[in-house]
């Protein structure tokens, strides 16, 4: 839906924020769009498995910066999330080295229990070319103080709420 490329990991498997503190899948992740449709085609799964290993290479950041040289927008994680802190460091470096590109990062890793991730994601959010969105665990319109983005039922008409129908 966004007019840009994205870099993804496997939904649920590589989303440690998709589980609550007891290890149960949070409501929003129980209906995750990235667990059906084109996301479950063999080539799509193969690409996400490749990405899971590829980011560990020393050349990853330099090559990613090169690939984004002509891009205006980029989305991190239409599936998956920043599972590893070292990956977060590399993503931050890519963002810093591509000021011409607007990065969008939806994430569940801003939960207080992921302290190291929170610190580096907050650094990302300070960059003028980065938009970080804390993805809600809820599907009933409730959200915590950490963010203001959530999933709501279609029949919900709360005053002051902007609905994105993407």
Predicted regions span which residues?
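Class I S-adenosyl-L-methionine
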Residues: 1-166
């Amino acid at each position: 839906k966004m007019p840009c490329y994205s870099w993804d990991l496997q939904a649920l498997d590589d989303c440690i924020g998709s589980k609550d503190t007891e290890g149960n899948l949070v409501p929003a992740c129980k209906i995750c769009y990235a667990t059906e449709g084109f996301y479950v085609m063999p080539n799509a799964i193969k690409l996400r498995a490749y990405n899971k290993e590829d980011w560990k290479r020393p050349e990853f950041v330099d090559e990613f910066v090169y690939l984004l040289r002509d891009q205006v927008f980029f989305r991190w994680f239409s599936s998956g999330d920043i599972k590893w802190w070292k990956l977060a460091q590399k993503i931050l470096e890519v963002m810093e080295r591509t000021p011409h590109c607007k990065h969008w990062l939806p994430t569940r890793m801003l939960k207080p229990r992921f302290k190291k991730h929170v610190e580096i994601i907050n650094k990302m959010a300070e960059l003028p070319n980065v938009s970080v969105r804390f993805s809600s665990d809820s599907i009933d319109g409730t959200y915590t103080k950490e963010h203001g983005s959530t999933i709501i039922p279609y029949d919900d008409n709360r005053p002051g709420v902007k609905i994105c129908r993407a």
